[in-house]
């Protein structure tokens, strides 16, 4: 590969085909952190003195995000910077989540970061395994169902942790996959909600995505080079539904045309910005919401997705929900 195109001193380790850079391992790590720092600055994601909740699952993306944000907070100029809190959700996937949660706890202990953990069982009265026990004959994907509950769980953890902003580890691949899926589903309204920095007028916590401009492959390499122990096994439910097909298609496109994901990302941001300005959201990235008729949480419709999904689960599962959960849904 030759010498590093950045420092010119060490042998190159990784080539970014979309930019032509051939980087040594240290320069790759440094430029990845710099890219995240620029993204945070570009979208005004974080402010000094804020309490930042980092959604940490135990996978490569979330652990890398936690380490990068911790690094950006470190050093002699760290006074007045963000205070980090890890927000971890236990979905209840037997044989999978225990390892990831252990990795999350390990990095939090190493970095001295507070951790707040919530579970589906405590919040909704059932685990993800229980919720999906009935789903074999239905068209709804596991990821769609889990996503609804996971977003609510992170919100609940954020409130308990009293944070000002939640940082999630969605990378560039996640972003363009979601953009493509919304296009394929004809969901124009959701396209207006894809801003890397969003807020709801009825919810006090902002949501930001600092890894938005980093390829998934590069996040994985950063985690490897940083010697971050993370769960490499995929969720047993992740290969269901449209997202898996979209992921494979975009990866094939990128392999043939390096940089295509960056082009799609720029297009997605342009569409999101235009829809926001055209009034499909309240201001820059703010969603228009109403209180859910059942739980009172902010919702884009009369009844929120969590309440609708919970009712579906209770109607089809083979277990009896706890009395407390039934009372909360009424």
Residue ranges and their predicted role:
Residues 3-181, 185-192, 197, 201, ...:
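ATP-dependent adenylation/nucleotidyltransferase module used to activate substrates
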